[in-house]
Amino acid sequence: MNAYSHNLLKEKYPTKQDVITEIMNLEAILHLPKGTEHFVSDLHGEYTAFDHVLRNGSGSIKQKIQDYFSDRMTEQTMQDFALLIYYPEDELALVKKKLRTENELQQWYLDNISHLLEFLELSGSKYTRSKVRKALNPNFVYITEELLYNDPQEFNKRSYINQLLKNILKLDQADKFIIATCYTIQRLVVDHLHVLGDVYDRGEEPDKIMDRLMNYHSVDMQWGNHDLLWLGAMAGSKLCMLNLLRICARYNNLNIIEDAYGINLRHLSRFAEEQYEDNPQFRPKLTNGDGYRFNGEKLQITQIHQAVAMMQFKLEGQVIARRPELKMDDRDLLNKIDYKKNVINLNGKEYSLQNTCFNTVDPKNPNELTDEENAIVDELLISIQHSTKLKRHLDFMMNKGSMYRTYNGNLLFHGCIPADEEGNFCSLKIGSKEYSGKKLFDFSEKMIRKAYSKPNVKDDFATDFMWYLWQGALSPLFGKKSMTTFERYFIADKACHEEVKNPYYKLRENKDFCIKILQEFGFAGDDTNHIINGHTPVKRGHNAICAEGYMLVIDGGYSKAYQPTTGIAGYTLLYNSYGLQLVSHQPFTSKQDAIRSGKDIVSTVRVVKHELQRKSVADTDIGENIKEKIRVLYNLLRNYD
């Protein structure tokens, strides 16, 4: 330790006893049980379902209730108690309607406050008192600690405790105290949240998800392909921006742009109305219960959808020409059309085109935007980059996010490791350098951060590369040979709609391939390590646990569009001191249904790995940091003057 570091530590620990106290505290912390990690993925803007999963900790709260209260509560009482913890405001309102007399309500308050305090003590038992205190509502720290750490059966304190409880009721604080305690329990049951990508996509409330995450106590994120479109737009990529606008129009979610983020689409709407007519291929796709806000909105969105799609295809051609190293010439599609015959040549085969909307395309220079299109794109990008709320959300996503994360022996990422049929990692050549495996992830993250840090630079390689990450064949976030958006719009032959997956998705069933990936990212690759992967829904009949447990696929299945394919609403993962648990969920209808029916959406919990010896903080990454700090403090102690 150099003299400067030594002096800094002495300032923090001014006496020898301060050093001893801190060492004792840290060494004790190492023996506490490991905190629970909660893994979710592919939220796709579905806020209410995601919020429910956070509130119930993927079933962990209900499980703790059953373990602790099953000999004292009926099944119905346990269900009601769980719902109280999930949705305290709603459950309190329901209870007040059910109970007939003031005495019944007072007794209900006393019973449930007592149960909540017991459950709070259980939930906080794996943490230091200091950490529990930080999780408490500031308005109730003193009274909660007095009730929590005193035995009501102790004779000398019995009257004191009873009076505290009576005063909570007498001063009309029962509701506030119960609500605060329930949210503290939610916070303590899960120590850390991992979000494996795609907050954004077709769902209508990604902004609420971002607000929720920004207020969450401990979270990290691994970026998904849909997230990259929004990050790319904020970084200055017009092409990323047009893609996200097209997706919002396609799924009738332009209100995200206009209402949630305050971006004006008036010029775009007027231009689309002038240039485009109704087109069945571009009508919005509606999910159950979805509809239109006003007469004529369906046509308006259909026209906007066509306008942004055509601008997107033009700019794709421009970026492809500007970046030959990305080898995407096969996607310069507007240059492959015979506009007189209305056909396109793809891979040596000619296809007729249908539902075309090439009004603004100049056959001699098909990738050129018109003057008005240029003006619209520039205006929209300025509006997006100046949306205070969107900037706040995406800055948070950048700060908390990464292409991948290694955490407590596990490797987390959203998409894939591009590979060939033999299991060799594919290389992307940029200039004189080649990037594959971990290096490809690191290079991708470097480009994302570079582009995001220079939002006024709109045509550099880093900004263009963000679009490549959306749909490039060797993108770790895409995982397919090509994105056939154009073909789906304009070609009837469904054979050319197919998007061929990278061999990775077959190879990840193989144990040796998964071990190879783990070793690529610095792990030993033994049975203490796992890959946790999102991005692809687990289809009905397929297994979320692959390669003898080395690979866990946890696409959350929040998007309603995928649920008929999967048969469920996807998976989440819990990793506590006892091991790994894969949780499958049933589709979430609404908060009101959950409260009214009393049913949860957790259907099955499957133990992936049960630890023979319960894991402690010492076995975690945080534990390693604490051990290093202890070593430094012992060194300081030995050399203390």
From Swiss-Prot:
Domain of life, per lineage = Bacteria
Cofactor(s) needed by this chain: Mn(2+)
Q: Which Pfam families match?
A: FBPase_2 (PF06874)
Q: Under the GO molecular function aspect, what terms does this record hold?
A: fructose 1,6-bisphosphate 1-phosphatase activity
Q: Does the keyword Ribonucleoprotein apply?
A: no
Asked whether the keyword Lipid metabolism is assigned, the reply is no
What EC number(s) are associated with this protein in UniProt?
Answer: 3.1.3.11
Q: What pathway does the annotation place this protein in? A: Carbohydrate biosynthesis; gluconeogenesis
**What reaction is this protein's catalytic activity?**
beta-D-fructose 1,6-bisphosphate + H2O = beta-D-fructose 6-phosphate + phosphate
Name its GO BP terms in alphabetical order.
gluconeogenesis
Keywords on this record?
Carbohydrate metabolism, Hydrolase, Manganese, Plasmid
Similarity remark? Belongs to the FBPase class 3 family.
What this protein is called in its record is Fructose-1,6-bisphosphatase class 3
What is the phylogenetic placement of the source species in the record?
Answer: Bacteria, Bacillati, Bacillota, Bacilli, Lactobacillales
Chain's gene name = fbp
